[in-house]
Amino acid sequence: MEPSALSPSGATLPLPLSLAPPPLPLPAAAVVHVSFPEVTSALLESLNQQRLQGQLCDVSIRVQGREFRAHRAVLAASSPYFHDQVLLKGMTSISLPSVMDPGAFETVLASAYTGRLSMAAADIVNFLTVGSVLQMWHIVDKCTELLREGRSAATTTTVTTAAAPSVSVPCASVPSGNGGTVAPATVGSVRSHTSSRASENQSPSSSNYFSPRESTDFSSTSQDAFVASAAGSGNRRDGGPVFPAPVVGSAGTTSGKLLLEADELCDDGGDGRGAVAPGAGLRRSNCMPASAVPQKHWVYVKQARNCPAPASLVHQDPDLEDEEEEEDLVLTCEDDEDEEMGGGSGVPAGGEPEATLSISDVRTLTEPADKGEEQVNFCESSNDFGPYEGGGAGAGLDDPGGPTPSSYALTHPPRPLLPLDVPGNQILVFPSSSSQAPGQPPGNTAEHGAVTLGGTSAVGLGIPSGSGGAPGGTGNSDGNKIFLCHCGKAFSHKSMRDRHVNMHLNLRPFDCPVCNKKFKMKHHLTEHMKTHTGLKPYECSVCAKKFMWRDSFMRHRGHCERRHRMGVGGVGSGPGPGPGPGTPSGPALQPKRESSTVGGGSGDEANSATPPSHRRVWSPPSVHKVEMDFSGGGGAAH
């Protein structure tokens, strides 16, 4: 008999091996996925510990005399600038420009390992500079957003989001820099940030291929939340608006600092704004760059203290304008959101001048009317704005018969500005309203747009006729300029912004491997390499002469072809010293030619003595003359 599987006491006995069910075989094509989500953070944490202990570090970075050790693989993965330095050039020691703050760089270097960045509100500009040099655009975008939010929060008391519900973050009051307290703030729910940079396909050598991780859900925990609170005082008599004192949503941790993820936690639009308490906040640094000033409105920067007041802006001769060095007026751009209409100018109420000339003193041409100041007209050329002015060339802001600026600023379209970009191309603008009655003075707010001005030929402005259009049409391309530099200029492509940043910092990242000459642009290095290879790819079809540079070849080809045509077309049919056939005649322009000592001359010689009309040179009879023979012979002197 088979032994019972149960013991007399009822306990289960182990089955014999032969009776155990066999394991189910896995299909041959099956793939088993195993995820270890904690490995990524643990790996970076381990690398950061190695960096802090100086272990396995293979690259050193010097900033203003201080040296930092790091891992080249981490640097190349986190910064396009370091990618070019350590991967393409194989450098083991990198010296960064002295414009960077060593403390800010140390924090940014740690954020490459930890994914977190902690900064004081007054040091945001330093971090913006470091991010611009290292081309870490997620830091540049975040610092720009914080500066923009701080500026807008200083001009409003409470801004609530209209598209999403708000989430209240309770926190204790934090003392501000001027003795006030910051009330608990409200943070709007933030959409995950989707950037168009992630879809760009660029070569690693262009320093523009890098794009940070884009979408990350906003965490409401105390470690991932931050609230920007601002002061309500609008007085800027001692250096500009106050910057908000940040509040971190955890009691007793990182008071007075901003704790933010290196990934994009918030979208650039800033859906939510914090409720503010009057008198709170830290003052914004006077050296803040123009990145804090968003785009698309002309603004007026006032003069420094003790500077002579500028004369009224009237139309002057261009030569005289160059000599007016004491006016020191600067035009920049400002975002069309957070703007209020009214009158404004560069003279404070009460006549007290500003202490410093900084970006914190920027005032738009359309400031609130309570400033009690006059508007300033920056564009005095009536020729530029004729299509929009029905009052003729003399119509302007100073027209005594027209309405005051405060009366028409809210009801009339803006006055267009016609600035020039860096290459000298004209940037067209259009008014915010599609029509304007003749004789009415325009407003002062200008919006950029690649459209054809009304009444102006598109051909005369150097743009295709099909590129123009009404506001909002296909011709408006300024909306695509989403890549901002910290100077305030916007670009439609990230590669253009990278080249612009290199120009700012005078960086020359491309050096010749033969002679070590450095260049700002990669195509400059490519052209320079021709001097070492001796390659001359351009050959003249007339004289078979070869050229290395295309512009030299094009200049030579034009002259060579003209000489060839003159030599072939100027052959005469008979001997004689007279001019050959086809030679222009005229007593005023006909050069004199003395008769040859030889009995006769060919038609070639006769024609060669008289160049074409656009090359003819007049010689008085008493001057020794030289005949030029373009058919291949030498010149004969008489």
UniProtKB/Swiss-Prot annotation:
This is Zinc finger and BTB domain-containing protein 22. It is found in: Nucleus. Disulfide bonds: none annotated. Residues 171-223, 229-248, 335-354, 367-451, 564-638 are annotated as: Disordered. Belongs to the krueppel C2H2-type zinc-finger protein family. The keyword Chaperone does not apply. Keywords: DNA-binding, Metal-binding, Nucleus, Phosphoprotein, Repeat, Transcription, Transcription regulation, Zinc, Zinc-finger. A zinc finger (C2H2-type) spans 483-504, 510-532, 538-559. The keyword RNA-binding does not apply. May be involved in transcriptional regulation. GO terms for molecular function: sequence-specific double-stranded DNA binding; zinc ion binding. Residues 189-210 have a biased composition (Polar residues). SUPFAM superfamilies: beta-beta-alpha zinc fingers, POZ domain. Residues 57-121 form the BTB domain. It comes from the Eukaryota. GO terms for cellular component: nucleus. The modification Phosphoserine is found at S203.
